């Protein structure tokens, strides 16, 4: 008997078939206590603070995926914070979990809190078990089921292309120079989303034949998310065009930028969309609501609910963005005596923040032990 205790998934899951064969030859059983895998992701981000310099680092840690291949797109289109980027899958990493199943062992989930969001009861996820089969068998199953193959191809295509979120906050000074490259990136993203939708559309008829709740959830969720983000891209493009044609300066004396934020009057905003985009918005909501209802208390439903709460249309809102070194700040145009109370408070808070950052940098440089962050 072998007992493994780990907080990572490892980076050699491709050797699982070889390991299983060896264990069977020697009639060995493996039990593992390990992490919960992030949903459709290989890594999670862990915050580590150097005890001597107090410097904090966000370090990637291998903890997934829960399946042989990533079956859902990350769709890293908009920066919405770490809590949205990672979700619990409710299962262990594919390689370690399959290793135990093939040899009569157990995989004990240890949730160390590294993944934000809701936890899922394994009893509720039994209908959604990953395909714990060999690599060859997994590929064969995908080829025999057009819907599964379409999901895998659409997820792979978007994951390879959408690597960085679009900037939604632009400095008001010289905003037209920033709008051009932002619009170019936006159009490229919209094209990638369209490509994913074309792939899924080709398997629409196959949806009627698919019996796996897991793959049906994948298909409907991915289609809904692609459509929703396509509408958001259209809305953002309209804002960029309007600001480019008629650039404006923030009225708030503490602001120096414009941020594309979600419109609270979502229904009104969607009714103002052109017919094609309005239909996309309708289909997006239908797919996402179906997932939230038909697959309740699962990662798919959690992501669908999150998408439904994220408005499909944007509007400009005044914001503050630290300019590049040497750039003017909103309160630099007037002497202290002429600043408003709000500007004075903002100026003091900003300068205090910069002093703290400077002190931390100096402390790190003068530390007796100059170490790189560890590889977790």
Which role fits each region the language model picked out?
Residues 61-213:
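C-terminal "exit" segments of structured domains
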Residues 8-98:
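VWA/integrin I-like adhesion module and closely mimicked acidic/polar interface patches used
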Residues 215, 220-222, 280, 300:
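Structural signature of alpha-solenoid helical repeat junctions
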Residues 175, 233-292, 299, 315-338:
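Short coil/linker segments at helix-helix boundaries
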Residues 11, 206, 210-215, 291-305, ...:
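Short solvent-exposed coil/turn linkers within tandem alpha-helical repeat scaffolds
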Residues 222, 226-229, 307:
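"A position-specific structural signal for the A-helix of alpha-solenoid helical repeats
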Residues 56-64, 113-165, 306-368, 373-376:
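Pro/Ala/Gly-rich low-complexity, hydrophilic intrinsically disordered segments
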Residues 1, 24-31, 103-106, 297:
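Loop/turn elements at helix/coil->beta-strand transitions in domains of secreted/extracellular proteins
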């Amino acid at each position: 008997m072998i007992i493994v205790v780990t907080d990572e998934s490892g980076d050699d899951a491709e050797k699982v078939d070889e390991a299983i064969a060896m264990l069977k030859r020697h009639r060995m059983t493996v039990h593992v206590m390990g992490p919960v895998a992030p949903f459709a992701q290989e890594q999670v981000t862990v915050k580590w603070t150097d005890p001597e310099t107090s410097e904090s680092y966000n370090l990637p840690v291998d903890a997934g995926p829960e399946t042989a291949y990533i079956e859902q797109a990350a769709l890293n289109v908009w920066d919405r914070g770490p809590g949205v980027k990672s979700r619990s899958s409710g299962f262990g990493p594919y390689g370690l979990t399959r290793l135990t199943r093939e040899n009569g062992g157990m995989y004990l989930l240890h949730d160390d809190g590294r993944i934000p969001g809701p936890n899922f009861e394994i009893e509720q996820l039994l209908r959604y078990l990953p395909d714990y089969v060999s690599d060859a068998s997994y590929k064969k199953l995908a080829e025999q089921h057009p819907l599964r193959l379409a999901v895998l191809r659409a997820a792979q295509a978007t994951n390879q292309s959408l690597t960085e979120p679009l900037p939604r906050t632009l400095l008001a000074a010289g905003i037209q120079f920033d709008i051009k490259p932002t619009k170019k990136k936006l159009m490229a993203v919209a094209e990638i989303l369209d490509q994913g939708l074309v792939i899924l559309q080709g398997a629409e008829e196959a949806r009627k034949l698919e019996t796996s709740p897991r793959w049906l959830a994948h298909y409907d969720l991915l289609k809904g998310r692609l459509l929703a983000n396509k509408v958001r891209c259209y809305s953002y493009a309209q804002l960029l065009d309007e600001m480019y044609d008629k650039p404006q300066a923030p009225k708030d004396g503490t602001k120096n930028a414009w941020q594309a934020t979600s419109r609270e009057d979502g229904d009104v905003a969607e009714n103002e969309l052109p017919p094609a985009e309005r239909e996309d918005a309708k289909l997006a909501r239908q797919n996402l609501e179906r997932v939230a209802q038909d697959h309740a208390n699962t990662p798919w439903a959690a992501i669908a609910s999150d998408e439904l709460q994220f408005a499909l249309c944007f509007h400009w809102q005044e914001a503050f963005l630290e300019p590049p070194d040497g750039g003017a700040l909103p309160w630099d145009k007037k002497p202290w005596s002429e600043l408003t109370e709000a500007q004075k408070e903002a100026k003091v808070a900003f300068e205090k923040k910069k002093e703290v950052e400077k002190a931390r940098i100096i402390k790190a440089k003068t530390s007796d032990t100059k170490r790189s962050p560890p590889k977790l």
